From Swiss-Prot:
Species the sequence originates in: Psychromonas ingrahamii (strain DSM 17664 / CCUG 51855 / 37)
GO BP, sorted A to Z: DNA replication, Okazaki fragment processing
NCBIfam families: PRK09482.1
Binding of K(+), residues: I179, V190, I193
Cofactor(s) recorded in Swiss-Prot or TrEMBL: Mg(2+); K(+)
Positions of the 5'-3' exonuclease domain: 171-258
Residues annotated to bind Mg(2+): D112
Stored InterPro entries: 5-3_exonucl_a-hlix_arch_N, 5-3_exonuclease, 5-3_exonuclease_C_sf, DNA_polI_H3TH, FEN, HhH2, PIN-like_dom_sf, Xni
Region ranges (Interaction with DNA): 192-197
Statement: the UniProt record of this protein carries the keyword Metal-binding: yes
Function per UniProt: Has flap endonuclease activity. During DNA replication, flap endonucleases cleave the 5'-overhanging flap structure that is generated by displacement synthesis when DNA polymerase encounters the 5'-end of a downstream Okazaki fragment.
Official protein name in the record: Flap endonuclease Xni
Note describing how the cofactor binds: Binds 2 Mg(2+) per subunit. Only one magnesium ion has a direct interaction with the protein, the other interactions are indirect. Binds 1 K(+) per subunit. The potassium ion strongly increases the affinity for DNA.
Length: 262
């Protein structure tokens, strides 16, 4: 029997729900209470839809990560989590636990890396994993075993659709972001080359390494920019690539889900 692990990108879900309540109620206890209730109902719905054998909610610790250590500008300019919501997270985690779902958070690792590590381990065991998030960074993980589900659109992100939309393969995504950067995370990439230029280079040469090789002896304007900012591209790729080698300290059996409402 194939197991199905449901991984909730908890802050991705909670912050979007809180943003809706915040518009209606401001940063008030009413907004927090509504968020707690709505988030719990969302989790119930996800469990009902996907019928997982295993499940976990992964939270960010909000502490500086290894990405901040090698690139201090990482995520500069992002709005911090509202203090009221931050104070309410333990109660949300407790509600998740009451539904039979544990929460995972560590001081050393970002939630995205923890999620990637969990998903990778499941895929290597030929089991099924469903990540619930709107974060495009998880596109790089998509394969036969790992799926991405957008709760707010009530739909899966399909690999073929990503390919058609982006114009490149899943395997080329990190090379693409290494060139274009990711503005929402303040990752610069190669200045002067946007989406169109990055696509052109990857469609022609296939990979970032091949682009570097071609740039060595070329007068092409795009390749010249790549050559002069090669270190930026290498750093950007390191930043956008999710880690899958974190020692978690637990096994899949520890995440088994049993419906506590029965």
């Amino acid at each position: 029997m194939i197991s199905t692990l449901l991984i909730i990108d908890a802050m991705n879900l909670v912050r979007r729900i809180y943003a809706v309540q915040q518009k209606q109620h401001g940063d008030t206890p009413t907004a927090l209470i509504a968020t707690q209730s709505t988030t719990t109902n969302a989790l119930k719905k996800l469990l009902r839809i996907h019928q997982p054998t295993h499940a976990i909610c992964v939270f960010d610790s909000h502490a500086p990560s290894w990405r901040h250590q090698i690139y201090p500008e990482y995520k500069q300019g992002r709005k911090p989590i509202p203090e009221l919501l931050k104070q309410g997270l333990p109660a949300i985690q407790e509600q998740f636990f009451d539904l039979g779902i544990d929460s995972l958070v560590t001081e050393e690792d970002e939630a995205d890396d923890l999620i990637a590590c969990l998903a990778d381990k499941i895929a290597k065991q030929q089991q099924k994993c469903i990540i619930v998030s709107t974060d495009k960074g998880f596109y790089q993980l998509l394969n036969e075993s790992i799926q991405l589900y957008d709760y707010f659109q009530n739909s899966f992100v399909i690999r073929q659709q990503v390919h058609q939309k982006m114009g490149i393969s899943i395997q080329q995504l990190n090379d693409y972001w290494a060139i274009t950067g990711i503005s929402s995370s303040a990752i610069k990439g190669v200045e002067g080359i946007g989406s169109k230029g990055a696509l052109s280079l990857l469609q022609q040469y296939g990979s970032l390494n091949n682009i570097f090789q071609q740039a060595e002896d070329s007068n092409n304007k795009l390749l010249t920019k790549i050559k002069s900012q090669q270190s930026n591209a290498i750093l950007a790729k390191q930043l956008v690539t999710l880690k899958t080698d974190i020692k978690l300290g637990f096994n899949l059996k520890d995440l088994r889900y049993t419906d506590s409402t029965d």
